[in-house]
Design a protein with these regions (language model features):
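Non-catalytic, polymerase-adjacent accessory regions of viral genome-replication enzymes
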Residues: 1-62
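Residues immediately flanking
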Residues: 45, 98, 109, 154-156
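Short alpha-helical scaffolding segments that buttress acidic/His motifs in well-ordered protein cores
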Residues: 33-37, 106, 184-189
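Conserved polymerase palm-domain catalytic core
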Residues: 67-68, 72-82, 86, 118-122, ...
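Duplex nucleic acid-engaging cores and interfaces of nucleic-acid transaction enzymes
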Residues: 99, 103-106, 132, 150
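Conserved phosphate-binding loops in nucleotide/dinucleotide-binding enzymes
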Residues: 92-97
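Electropositive, glycine- and tryptophan-enriched low-complexity nucleic-acid-binding patches
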Residues: 105, 109-124
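Solvent-exposed aromatic/hydrophobic patches embedded in short alpha-helical segments
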Residues: 102-107, 111, 216, 220
Length: 250
């Protein structure tokens, strides 16, 4: 990771609230994200492929940065499609435009650097050097070696589609005071969805198919579940209790 984004983690360790983040979304970081995206074959909702965007990359990114600085850049509504699930049902999937993927990709990297020092050890999903196998191992170790008699397995139904925007922004504002950076997060949250030619407003939930959605989900659950359990539940207990979370499964 280059272009200064790697410095955010150190800043986040020392400062409880970060004031300037939007400047990390610049030509260099967008170009770096574009190179990451080139290996994928997916086409954005606007029909633009990576190779098409790459053919005039300097002008395209210069124009994108200019629009972001003047706040004339607005994310497009994602196109909703459906993919089959293992149980035979269909899972909705959102396809964003290519430029939106670039901006979201950079903003997601920034958010991950902000929050990685702040997330608790009980969280395993969508985090650097953490995975489901580690979560399973941790659960196994707790059952085998700690004073655990009961296991409660929970899955938050429809979590990603029902995240409360107002509370999510409050959580972000607790750690980030860069209004311009937060403004673009709100725009992504409110960008809407196109299905069968009809625009559906986004009143709740994280962007479908968005690169920024996993870290936003982790921020939300960090406050409403992880921190709540650690700071408010554990001190009231006489025995032992542990939380192991992978995304919305815990």
């Amino acid at each position: 990771m280059s272009n200064g984004i790697q410095d955010i983690r150190k800043l986040s360790t020392y400062y409880p609230n970060l004031e300037t983040l939007i400047h990390y979304v610049n030509y260099d970081t967008l170009l770096e994200e574009h190179k990451r995206q080139l290996s994928s074959k997916a086409v954005g909702v606007d029909g633009v492929t990576k190779k098409e965007y790459d053919s005039n990359i300097e002008e395209n990114l210069t124009n994108l940065v200019k629009r972001m600085k003047t706040f004339s850049y607005r994310p497009r509504p994602v196109r909703r499609t459906y993919i089959p699930k293992a149980n035979g049902k269909l899972r909705p999937l959102g396809i964003p435009s290519y430029e939106d993927k670039l901006v979201q990709g950079v903003m997601a990297r920034i958010l991950n650097e902000v929050y990685e020092p702040r997330f608790l050890d009980c969280s395993y999903g969508f985090r650097e050097n953490r995975n489901a196998h580690q979560a399973i191992t941790e659960v196994n170790q707790l059952i085998m070696y700690r004073k655990v008699n009961y296991v409660l397995d929970c899955d938050i139904k429809g979590f990603f589609d029902n995240v409360d925007h107002k509370w999510l922004m409050k959580f972000l504002e607790h750690d980030i005071s860069d209004k311009n950076f937060l403004r673009y997060i709100v725009r992504f949250l409110k960008s809407g969805c196109m299905e069968n030619g009809q625009l559906e407003e986004s009143k709740k939930g994280t962007p479908q198919g968005g690169l920024i959605s996993p870290v936003l989900a982790n921020v939300y659950l960090h406050y409403v579940l992880d921190s709540w359990f650690t700071k408010h539940v554990l001190p009231t207990l006489k025995g032992e209790a542990y939380l192991v979370r992978f995304a919305d499964d815990f």
